[in-house]
Amino acid sequence: MEANKNTYSRLGDTIETVERIEFCINSNESIIRHSAIVDPNGITEAETFNSNNNEPVQGGVIDKRLGVTESHLECSTCGETALRCPGHFGHIKFVEPVFHMGYLIYLKHILSCICIRCNKLLVYKNEKEIAALIKNKQGKQRFAEIRSICKKVTHCQKENYGCGTPAHKISIDKRNGNIFLLAEPVKRTDEYDETGETRKRPQQILTPQLCYDILKSVSDEDCIIMGFDPAKSRPEDMIILNFPVPPVQVRPSIRAEILSSPTMDDDLTHKLIDIIKSNENLKNTKGDGSLIKYTSINDDFMLLQLHVATFFANDMAGLARSQQKNKKVTKSMSERLRGKEGRIRGNLMGKRVDMSARTVITSDPNIALNEVGVPLIIAKNLTFDEIVTEHNIEYLTQLVKNGKRVYPGANFVIKHVIDAEGNESGHIYHLKYVDKPISLKPGDIVKRQLIDGDIVIFNRQPSLHKLSMMGHKCHVIPDNNLLTFRVNVSVTDPYNADFDGDEMNLHVPQSIQTATEILLIANASRRFVSPATSNIAIKAKQDTLMGSYVQTEPDMEIDWRDAMSILMSTSVKLDNDIPKYQNVSGKFLYSQIIPEGLNITKRKNDKEFQLKIKNGELTDGTLGKSEISSILQRIWFQYGSKETQEFIDDAQRMILQFLMRYGYTVSIKDTVIGEKVNQYIYDLIETKRKETLAFITEYDNDPYVMTKDAFEIKLQENLKSVQDEIKNTVMRNFDKNSGIFIAISSGSSGEPMNAGQIAGCIGQVIVEGKRIQIRFNGRTLPMFPKFDDSAFSRGFCRNSFIEGLGPFEFFFQVMAGREGIINTAIKTADTGYIQRKLVKMLEDIKQEYDGTVRNANGKLISCVYGDNGINTENQVDQKIDLISANDNKVRNDYVYTEDEIKYLIKNHKTDKRYTTDLNNSLYRKLISMRDQLRRIQRLVNLTSAEFKETYKMPVDIQQFIFNIINRDVRNNNVVVDPYYVLKMIKDMYYGSDSKIMKYNNRTSRIKKEDEKRIKFLMKIYLYDVLAPKKCTHVYKFSKQEFDEIVDYFKKTIMLAKVEGGEMVGFVAAQSIGEPVTQTNLKSFHKSGTGKTVSGGLVRVKELLGISKNIKTPITEIILEEKYKNDKITASRIASYLKYTTLRDVVEKADVIYDPEPFSKDGLMKKDGVDNIFDQEQGKTGCQTDIKNLPWVLRIMLSKEKMIERNINMLEIKTSFCRNWGTRNEDKTSKKEFNKVIDKITQCAIVTNYDNSQVPIVHVRFDANNYNLNTLIQFQEMVINTYKIKGISNITESNNIIEESYVDFDDEGNVVKKKQYVIIAEGINLSEMSQINGIDLLRTKCNDIVTIYEMYGVEAARTAFIKEFTAAIESSGGFSNYQHIEILADAITHMGGLIPVNRHGANKLDTDPFSRASFEKTVEQLLAAAVFGESDHMRSVSARIMVGALINGGTGCFDLLLDHKKIQQSLVESEEVVAPVVPIKKKTVLDDLISKKKSK
C-alpha cells in the first residue's frame, strides 16, 4: 500500500482570493533584488550542461539556482525537486544599457515632452491652464494631454524655469537593423541657406546611455504631471541595465534518458546564450587597452541590442528575424503571451481540463431528451468525488472493492490523514495497483466511476450561444463495443449538430454544488426557449414531424392492439381508456400524450381549423412543424419543463413505434407529375421568356427609361416569379399520400422550392445577388451570342432535376454552388471574429439587484434591461386588437352603452360606482392609448405599409382566459363587477408585484414616471384583453375566475423579470452573434428603388465598427406635407440634390493661348462666345475685362447631359465665379491646387447661349508663373472640383418612388396612403436642411456617425438599433430587441460612439487583464506597467485568469447559514414502515391474466 502513496495534497491549505494585481516596470534595482544569482555580474556563462559530469553549468543559463526541471536534481535556491520548485529569476549585468523594445514608443513620447538639455518639462507645470487640464485625468489620459500641449512648444523658454533650448522632435530609426532614437529641433533658426536650399536640421543620436541619464534626472513631480507613478514606474527603468533571466521552468531543456545525449534547449535559452555571448564580446572589446575602432564597439553593441529586442519580440518591422542554426525562427517572449495559442487565451482564459471526454455522436430514439448515452469505456475513466459518510460507506466500500476494472467501481481513494504536527493531508491511492483492501472512514474521498443519473455538461463546438452547453443525465451503455455518445434527435438543434460524424464534448462536474447548479439551471429540459428569439429551441425533428403528420391525418385509423403496443413505449398511464376490438383514430392516439387541460385553437380560415385542441384532446388539424411547435410553446408556458420534456419524449417514441408498423418510403415515382402539368409549366416558361425578350427590346429602344440596375432587377424579379408559380403548381399536383409531399408538408425535410426544382423547373440561377454576368468577350458562355440578355443566356434553367440538366445549365448550377462554398469559408472566419468582439465588449455587463444594468466597474449602462426588465426566455407573442380598432369598434367592444350600464345596476351586477362618466372616461382613455401607440409606430417607421399588432409580453392572459372558457364546469352565474375589474387592472400594472424599477413611491417621482413609460405597452395589453365589457359579456367571468387571472398575472410577472446577477451582456453577445453567422455576405435590393444597399455581414461589420465611410450611404428624403403627393416638386428637388461638376456635362476640354480675344477670326468669334459674366466681384473674383487674360480653358459641353441634369449657362457661370471667389477658403483642396491658385492672378468666364447648337465655355486667365504642369492642374481643378449645383456627397438622386404608408382617419380607421419619397445615394443632412420642401425631421439616413454629429447620442442609439435590426433581418435572422438594445447602450453609454473592436475596448473603463485578453496582449500589459495601473479583479476575464468565481450568476451573492437554528431543528427520526398497498385490477392486468389462462 505504501507504493501507492506517490502523490499527496494538503487538505488544510487555504487558497486566498486575489483582490488586486498591481502593474509596474521591473526596475533595474528590483531585478538585482529578486535575482537568485549573488554575483553582481549575474549569468556569465553561455553554456548549458557541463560535459564532464552532465550537470548544469554553474553560472550558466540553466544554473540550478534558477530552478530544476529534471527529477533527479534539486534546486540550489529552495532545495526542492522539479515537482515542487517554482523556479527563480536570475540576471545578466549589461556592459552598456540597451533599449527595451516594448517601451521604445513610450521613451520617444516622454523625450518629446522634456528638454533634453535641462531635463525639465517643456510646459510650465505651475500654469493654471495646465493644472486645470490634467486635474481629473490620470495615467494615459493625462499623458496624452501633456503630449498634445508639448507638440505646440518650440522652446524650453519659460523665464526662470527653462533653458531656452529648442524643443526636439524624437523619432525611432531602425535602418540597417540598428535601433536609434534621433532628436532634431522643431524650430529652425534659418529657413534657407545662402543657395536658397532648405537648411538641414541638425540631428542628435540618443543612445540608451544618454536616454538613461536624461530620464534619471527627470523629477518625480514631472513624472506625476505626465501621468506616471514614480513609486512604481520611473521612466529610466524602461532602459535595461540588468537583464532578467527567466526561471528554467518556463524554458525547460529536454534531454533523453541517456545523460550523455545532447539536449534540446528552449528558444528562450538559445536567445539567452546569444545575449550572454554578445554582452561578453562587448565587455572584451571595451576592456582591451589597445586602440579599438569605434565601429567595432558599435557593432557589438548593436548586436546585443538586436538579441535583446528579438528576445522580447521577434517580428518587429525593420529588424531581421532571429533564427536558429536549422533556420527555424525563434519564438520570442511576446509570441508566448499573445494570440489564440498564447498564455493568456490558451492557458488562462481557456485550458485543457481533466474529467472530460470527446467522441462521435449517434442518434438514439429511446434515450430521453435530457439524457446522454455514455460508452462504458468513458464511464470507467471519468470519476466524481464522493465524500464518505455514514450513509454511503457500504456502497462506496463495494465500489472500492470493484476497483477500476469492474464496473461500477472507483479509480482513486483519498485518505484523510492528520500528521503529528496537526497538518491535514490526503494520501491518494490508485486502485489500479491496489493489492490489499482499503478501509474507508467518514471524510475520505472516493473517486467513483460515472453511473446512471450523474449530471454532466454536454457541449458542441463552436459554442455560439448559451444553449451550446447544457446539462444532461448520464445513461451508461453497458456494451464495450459501443463507443459513441447517444443523443436524442430533438436536442440537436440548439447544438447545431447532426449525425454525419459530428463530435461532442462531455464534462463531469467535480462538486455537488456544481452538479446542482447544472441540474437546476443548465439542464436541457429547462432550456427549451432560446433567449435570442423567445421561441422554442428544442423541437420535434424529421421522423417525429413526418410521423405526426401521417398519424393525425383525418382518415388514419389504427388497430386497437397496435394502439396499445404503441402507447406502451410512452409514459402514458396504464389506466387510460383505450376502446378494445375497434380501430382508433390517429388523433385519438396522439391526444393521449397531450397534457390534460391544454387548449389551442388556430384557424386556417373561417370554416376550417388548422389546429384545435380542447382539454388535451386533438379534435381538428393535421400536425406538422408549426403545429407541434405551437403545442410545445403552450405546454412550456402553461405547465413547465417536466411536461414539455415528457411530451417530446413520448411523441418521439410513439411516432417511431407507429412508423415501424405503418411504414414510410420515398421513391422516384413520387416526383412524377402528369403530362398536362408538364405542358402547363412549359407554356409558363415560354410566356415569361417572351416577356423578357419584349422587355429587353423596349429597353434597347429607350435606355433612358430606367437605369441599367433597375432594368436588371426587373428582369430578375420577372424570371424568379416563374419559380414561385411552378413550386405551387407542383405541390398542388403531387399525390397527397406520396412520401415527398408528406416530408415537405410536415416540415420534416425540404421545402416547396425543392419540389419545384425536382419535378418542374430549376429556374433562375443567382450568383452574387444577380443573374449570371456577361464577362469574357461579351458572353456568359461561348455558345451564346454577344451581349445576349435573354433568359437562357443569363442563367435561367428550364429543365428539372428529373429531366436532367443541359451543359450550360449544369455550368450555371456549379457557379452558384461554388459561390456558396466560398461564402461559407469567408463567413466562418468573419462571423467568428465578430462574435468574439461582441463577447469581449459586453462580457462584464450584468443585471444588478437594484434593477439597473451595469458593467464590472459599476458604470451605468441602462436603467432598465431591455426597456421592460423582462427575461427574454419568459415572453411570448401577444396580439393587441385595440391598435387596429376604430372608434366605433372601441365603443362597441370595449365599453358599455347606457342601456347596458342600467341593466348591470338593475340586476345588481355592479354598484352605482360604475357610472356613465366612468364609462366615457374609459372610452377616452382607450382612444388616447391607442392613438399614442399608433403615433409611436409612425415615428419609428414613417414609410411602413403595415403597422404592428403583435408584441412580446411576459404573460399570456389570452391563453389563460381561453383555458377558463373551455372548462367543463364554470361558476359564472354572477359575473364580476366591472368597477372591480377596472380597479384590479390598475392594481395589476401599478402594484408592487409588477414593479420593474426599484424606487421609493414618495421620493422618486422621476423613476415613477419612467416606470409608467416602461409599462405603457403592458397597460394597453391589460385594457385590451380585460376590458370590463369583455369580462362580463364575452368571457362572462365570475369574480373568482377574474381573481384567478389577477393571481396568475402577478405570479407570472414576478417570475418573468430578469434575475439579479444575470449576465445580460454575455447573453446579448451570443444572441446577436448566433444569427449573424446565418447572414449572407451580399447586398440586398431595396424594393421599388432599382438600387441595392449593403446588408447582411457587410452591413453588420460597418455598424459594429462605427464606420465613417459606409459602402452604400442612402438618404430617404421625406417631403413636407403639402408636397408629398406632388411628383413635379419631388423631381425638381431631386434634380437639385445630385452633386454636379463640369466633368458630368463636359465633352471636350483644351487649354489654348489666345492673346487677342476680340480678333475677328479669333477663338471667341469662332465659338460664338461673347456672353461675359458681368457681375463685378473685385480683384479676387471673376473679371469683366478679358483683354489681359491670354490663356483660355475651352470647354465643350454636352447639350443632352445639360438637359438631363437641368443645367443652363447662367448656373455654370454663377457657380464658377462663386467657386473662384471662395478658392482661398477651401481647406479641403489638394496642396497642388493651392499652388496653382497662388499662380493664377485673374480669371473670367465667357459662354455662348443656352440655345446654341454646341454649348461652349471659355475660362480666361492669366498667370505670373506657369508651366505645362500648372495649366494641366488648373484644368483638372476647374473641371473636376468646381461644383455647378447639388449637395456634396450626393452622387445620385433621380430615384423617386411612390411608397405606401399607414395612416388613420378622424374615426380611427386604418387608411393606406401614398407619398413620393426621394432615395438619394450619399448623405449630407446639414446642406439638405437648407432646401425648401424637405421635411428634415422625417428624412432618414443609414449613417450612424452623421446622425450622432447632427442630433446627438440618443438619436444615434435609436438609429443603431433600427439599422442593426434591419441588417440581421435582411438575411432572415432575428434577435430580440433587448439584446440589440444592450449592444446599443454599450456603444453609446459614454456619450459618444464606441466601436466594437480593440480601439473601442481601449476607450472603455476596463481593467488591464480584460483588455489584454482581447487583442494586443503584450502592448496592453506594457501600458499597464508604464502607468502603474491596478487590476481590481472585477471583470470576468480577470477573475477567470486567476481562477476566481466571477461576480455574476450564482457567484454574485453569498449564502448565510445559521448553524444554531439547524442544530435546534435536528430531531431523531423513527424508522417508518410503509403499509403494503394492494394491487387493484386494471384492464391491462385482466387481459394478461385471461391470456395466461387461455394458454
From Swiss-Prot:
<dbReference type="GO" id="GO:0000428">
    <property type="term" value="C:DNA-directed RNA polymerase complex"/>
</dbReference>
<dbReference type="InterPro" id="IPR042102">
    <property type="entry name" value="RNA_pol_Rpb1_3_sf"/>
</dbReference>
<comment type="similarity">
    <text>Belongs to the RNA polymerase beta' chain family.</text>
</comment>
<dbReference type="Pfam" id="PF05000">
    <property type="entry name" value="RNA_pol_Rpb1_4"/>
</dbReference>
<dbReference type="InterPro" id="IPR007080">
    <property type="entry name" value="RNA_pol_Rpb1_1"/>
</dbReference>
<dbReference type="InterPro" id="IPR007081">
    <property type="entry name" value="RNA_pol_Rpb1_5"/>
</dbReference>
<dbReference type="Pfam" id="PF04990">
    <property type="entry name" value="RNA_pol_Rpb1_7"/>
</dbReference>
<dbReference type="GO" id="GO:0003899">
    <property type="term" value="F:DNA-directed RNA polymerase activity"/>
</dbReference>
<keyword id="KW-0240">DNA-directed RNA polymerase</keyword>
<dbReference type="InterPro" id="IPR044893">
    <property type="entry name" value="RNA_pol_Rpb1_clamp_domain"/>
</dbReference>
<dbReference type="InterPro" id="IPR038593">
    <property type="entry name" value="RNA_pol_Rpb1_7_sf"/>
</dbReference>
<dbReference type="Pfam" id="PF04992">
    <property type="entry name" value="RNA_pol_Rpb1_6"/>
</dbReference>
<dbReference type="InterPro" id="IPR006592">
    <property type="entry name" value="RNA_pol_N"/>
</dbReference>
<keyword id="KW-0548">Nucleotidyltransferase</keyword>
<dbReference type="InterPro" id="IPR007075">
    <property type="entry name" value="RNA_pol_Rpb1_6"/>
</dbReference>
<dbReference type="GO" id="GO:0044423">
    <property type="term" value="C:virion component"/>
</dbReference>
<dbReference type="InterPro" id="IPR000722">
    <property type="entry name" value="RNA_pol_asu"/>
</dbReference>
<dbReference type="Pfam" id="PF04983">
    <property type="entry name" value="RNA_pol_Rpb1_3"/>
</dbReference>
<dbReference type="InterPro" id="IPR007083">
    <property type="entry name" value="RNA_pol_Rpb1_4"/>
</dbReference>
<protein>
    <recommendedName>
        <fullName>DNA-directed RNA polymerase subunit 1</fullName>
        <ecNumber>2.7.7.6</ecNumber>
    </recommendedName>
</protein>
<dbReference type="InterPro" id="IPR045867">
    <property type="entry name" value="DNA-dir_RpoC_beta_prime"/>
</dbReference>
<dbReference type="Pfam" id="PF00623">
    <property type="entry name" value="RNA_pol_Rpb1_2"/>
</dbReference>
<dbReference type="GO" id="GO:0003677">
    <property type="term" value="F:DNA binding"/>
</dbReference>
<keyword id="KW-0804">Transcription</keyword>
<dbReference type="InterPro" id="IPR038120">
    <property type="entry name" value="Rpb1_funnel_sf"/>
</dbReference>
<dbReference type="InterPro" id="IPR007073">
    <property type="entry name" value="RNA_pol_Rpb1_7"/>
</dbReference>
<keyword id="KW-0946">Virion</keyword>
<dbReference type="Pfam" id="PF04998">
    <property type="entry name" value="RNA_pol_Rpb1_5"/>
</dbReference>
<dbReference type="InterPro" id="IPR007066">
    <property type="entry name" value="RNA_pol_Rpb1_3"/>
</dbReference>
<dbReference type="GO" id="GO:0006351">
    <property type="term" value="P:DNA-templated transcription"/>
</dbReference>
<keyword id="KW-0808">Transferase</keyword>
<dbReference type="Pfam" id="PF04997">
    <property type="entry name" value="RNA_pol_Rpb1_1"/>
</dbReference>
<comment type="function">
    <text>DNA-dependent RNA polymerase catalyzes the transcription of DNA into RNA using the four ribonucleoside triphosphates as substrates.</text>
</comment>
